[in-house]
A protein has these predicted regions:
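Cysteine protease catalytic core and zymogen-processing segment of caspase-like enzymes
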Residues: 1-11
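Phosphate-binding and adjacent anionic-ligand microenvironments
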Residues: 12-211
Length: 211
């Protein structure tokens, strides 16, 4: 909501950054306004690195950490809350209505995450299995794997048959990321429907546990 509003009404300069596990809708918003978007590892420290070396309008991560370079190279929840309140006042809409407008313009994007508290042995074995899945002749949750990205964890881009015939259908992806400090694996997914996301998260849970 903030990115779309700033680009549409403020025209502030700079690129945009986003973490590896955040929505691809941001890419579509940037494409509309001719802005470059940088995808980086998970953690706000990567946003800071960009802000200290390049002209960055804003950057963010999945946990809600959003920063504006013209303000300071750090997250500021108070600023973001004030900006959102201003957007709602100017547009005369609730936050839910603003999100619905984005879904209409850029396609429905549904997102989910689960945390698995599992031991290091199971966690590491699951990541190792994910890394060797082949592209083309492998499927996940009934969806062909079309691309794999290992920037931070293992991320599968999938050919979701549910997206066929849908205008601006969200790209379907699934990310498995093992914590380096805890016996924990986080699993993220985004797709064009809540049902697809739920199915992928359930399949990923079974995969991580050895199913």
């Amino acid at each position: 909501v903030l990115l779309s509003w700033v680009l549409k009404h403020k025209g502030w300069p700079g690129d945009v950054t986003r973490a590896f596990n955040t929505t691809k809708m941001l890419d579509r918003i940037c494409a509309k306004y001719g802005r470059k978007i940088h995808e980086h590892g998970i953690g706000f420290k990567y946003v800071v690195d960009y802000m200290l070396t390049q002209e960055i309008l804003m950057g963010g991560e999945e946990s809600g950490g959003i920063g504006f370079q013209r303000h300071l190279p750090e997250r500021d929840g108070m600023l973001n809350a004030l900006l959102l309140a201003n957007v709602m006042a100017e547009e005369g809409k609730t936050l839910g209505q603003l999100v619905a407008d984005l879904q209409t313009e850029y396609g429905e994007h549904q997102y989910g995450r689960i945390d698995l508290h599992i031991g290091d042995e199971i966690k590491n074995r699951a990541i190792a299995r994910a890394r060797v899945l082949e592209i083309g002749d492998k499927v996940f949750a009934g969806m062909p794997i079309v691309r794999v990205d290992m920037l931070d964890g293992v991320k599968f881009y999938l050919d979701n048959p549910e997206a066929e015939g849908r205008q601006n259908a969200a790209e379907t992806w699934l990310l498995l990321r093992a914590s380096g400090t805890e016996p924990l694996m986080r699993i993220y997914s985004e797709s064009c429907s809540k049902e697809s996301v739920a199915r992928l998260l359930q399949a990923a849970r079974a995969f991580a546990l050895g199913g």
